[in-house]
Amino acid sequence: MDIEAYAVKNYVPLLATFETEALYKYVQKRYTEILKKIPHAWVIGGFDDPFLIPPDSVPATSEILSCLDTNIEKMWIVVTKGPNGPFGLVAEDLGNDKFRGFFTIDSKIIEKVIKIINNTMRIEINFSKE
């Protein structure tokens, strides 16, 4: 089961980052359905086109944000909430279809990643709330 499927099955929040608009467009239909089935989502990407994701296709419980020109832009992150706190995948896009990263169920590590994203983006991603 992938992280997104876990979020849907367990009705828990989801954080997903995409390096480029093209990578989001590849999964856009799938994500449009996922966002309707979870309590909250943060979708962050190197989005340059403000009309990439039509507002009427996104539930009010979802936040779509651009991380263009930040240190998050080259990151592929997918996080959800498990019984012991957040868990997920954190990877850096090295180019040429190569990534460097890790999957962890250690909530302290994921919470540190979320803190960096919150500080960089000046937002509040909080998996304690549903």
Residue ranges of predicted features:
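PLD/PLD-like phosphodiesterase catalytic module centered on the HKD motif
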Residues: 1-130
